[in-house]
C-alpha cells in the first residue's frame, strides 16, 4: 500500500468522524429545542460561507435518517455586492439536486447610501436581510427558517451584550418573529466553529467571502471572537464550560428581580431547587473544565447514522 493511499484513507476516516460529530450535535440540538417537526418545510439561508454550507449539507444528510419527514429549500439573498460571483451558488445547488431560490435585492446599494464611510454596516444590513428572508419564507410556504449561527457565535453574542449592551443575552437556538408568523432555528447551536472550518475545507465547499462585512476589521464582534479564540488556545475546554453555563442558569443567584422574587424571601421559607447557602461557601470546582477533551478524541467509528430523538 502506497504512502498516498494511507494518507487518503486517513483523510476519509477523519472526515467521517467529523461528519458524525456534526450530525450528532445538529441532531441533538434539533431534538432538544424541537426545531424541526413532521411535515416542516425548512428554508436554509445560504450565504456562501462555511457555516451555511455546512448547515445545508448536514441537514440534507439528516433528512434521510430522521424519523420524521421534512422538506428543504435553500435560499440565497444576492445583495448585489460588486464582484459577487452569481454563478457559484446556482451551480453548487444544482449539482447536489436541492430545491433553491436566488433572491435579488440591492441591499448593498441601500447600505452604502445610508451608512457613512468607515461606519459599521452590520445593523442595517441584517435588518434589511431579515425582512427580505421573512417575506421569502412566506412566499415559499416555509414553516422554519434555518440560520447558520454556531456555538461560538452564541458565545460571542453573550459577551457582546454584556460588554456593550449591559444585558445577559445571547442568540436563542429557536425564536419566533415579533409578528408571530416566522420561526427561526439555529441547528448548528451545539457545533464548534473549528469543526465547521475543518468540515468546509474537507468538503471543498465553494466559499464566497462577504466583502461588505469583511472590509470592517474593527468590528466589536471580531474583537470578542479573537478574545474567545485566545481563551480556547490557552485554556482548553473553557468555551465548552461557558456554553454549558448558558444552559444552566440559576436566576436566584443573579440580580434580576424580574426573574426571581427576592423581595418576598422570608425567614423560615424553603425554596425548592434553590441552594442559597452556596452564596457563603466556596464551591468545589474541578481543576480543569469538565469538557476539556469532549469530542476531540472520541472514537465514533462504530456510531450509526445519527437520528433525531423522538419528538412528541
Swiss-Prot record:
Residue positions of motif PP-loop motif: 47-52
One Gene Ontology biological process: tRNA thio-modification
Record field: catalytic activity: cytidine(32) in tRNA + S-sulfanyl-L-cysteinyl-[cysteine desulfurase] + AH2 + ATP = 2-thiocytidine(32) in tRNA + L-cysteinyl-[cysteine desulfurase] + A + AMP + diphosphate + H(+)
Pathway: tRNA modification
Pfam families noted in UniProt: ATP_bind_3
Cofactor(s) required, per the database record: Mg(2+); [4Fe-4S] cluster
Enzyme Commission identifier(s): 2.8.1.-
A GO molecular-function annotation: ATP binding
Subcellular location(s) of the protein: Cytoplasm
Binding annotation for [4Fe-4S] cluster: 122, 125, 213
Assembly and oligomerization: Homodimer.
Xref: PANTHER family: AMINOTRAN_5 DOMAIN-CONTAINING PROTEIN (PTHR43686:SF1), SULFURTRANSFERASE-RELATED (PTHR43686)
Further remarks about this protein from its record: The thiolation reaction likely consists of two steps: a first activation step by ATP to form an adenylated intermediate of the target base of tRNA, and a second nucleophilic substitution step of the sulfur (S) atom supplied by the hydrosulfide attached to the Fe-S cluster.
Recorded family membership: Belongs to the TtcA family.
NCBIfam families xref list: PRK10696.1
Protein name: tRNA-cytidine(32) 2-sulfurtransferase
Phylogenetic lineage: Bacteria, Pseudomonadati, Pseudomonadota, Gammaproteobacteria, Pasteurellales
Amino acid at each position: 500500500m502506497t504512502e498516498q493511499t494511507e494518507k487518503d484513507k486517513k483523510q476519509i476516516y477523519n472526515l467521517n468522524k467529523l461528519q458524525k460529530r456534526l450530525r450528532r450535535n445538529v441532531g441533538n440540538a434539533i431534538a432538544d429545542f424541537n426545531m424541526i417537526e413532521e411535515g416542516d418545510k425548512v428554508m436554509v439561508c445560504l450565504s456562501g460561507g462555511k457555516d451555511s454550507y455546512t448547515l445545508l449539507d448536514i441537514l440534507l444528510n439528516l433528512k434521510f435518517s430522521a424519523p420524521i419527514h421534512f422538506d428543504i429549500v435553500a435560499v440565497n439573498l444576492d445583495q448585489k455586492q460588486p464582484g459577487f460571483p452569481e454563478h457559484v451558488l446556482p451551480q453548487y445547488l444544482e449539482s447536489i439536486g436541492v430545491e433553491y431560490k436566488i433572491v435579488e435585492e440591492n441591499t448593498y446599494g441601500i447600505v452604502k447610501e445610508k451608512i457613512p464611510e468607515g461606519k459599521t454596516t452590520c445593523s442595517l444590513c441584517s435588518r434589511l436581510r431579515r425582512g427580505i428572508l421573512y417575506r421569502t419564507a412566506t412566499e415559499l410556504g416555509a414553516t422554519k427558517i434555518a440560520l447558520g449561527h454556531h456555538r461560538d457565535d452564541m458565545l460571542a453574542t453573550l459577551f457582546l451584550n454584556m460588554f456593550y449592551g449591559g444585558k445577559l443575552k445571547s442568540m436563542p437556538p429557536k425564536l419566533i418573529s415579533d409578528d408571530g408568523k416566522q420561526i427561526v432555528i439555529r441547528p448548528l447551536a451545539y457545533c464548534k466553529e473549528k469543526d465547521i472550518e475543518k468540515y468546509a475545507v474537507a468538503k471543498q465547499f465553494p466559499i464566497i467571502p462577504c466583502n461588505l462585512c469583511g472590509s470592517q476589521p474593527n468590528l466589536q464582534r471580531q474583537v470578542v471572537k479573537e478574545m474567545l479564540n485566545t481563551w480556547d488556545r490557552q485554556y482548553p475546554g473553557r468555551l465548552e464550560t461557558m456554553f454549558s453555563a448558558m444552559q444552566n442558569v440559576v436566576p436566584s443567584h443573579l440580580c434580576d428581580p424580574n426573574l426571581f422574587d427576592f423581595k418576598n424571601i422570608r425567614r423560615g421559607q424553603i425554596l425548592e431547587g434553590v441552594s442559597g447557602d452556596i452564596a457563603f461557601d466556596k464551591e468545589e470546582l474541578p481543576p480543569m473544565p469538565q469538557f476539556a477533551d469532549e469530542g476531540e478524541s472520541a472514537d465514533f467509528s462504530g456510531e450509526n447514522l445519527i437520528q433525531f430523538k423522538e419528538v412528541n
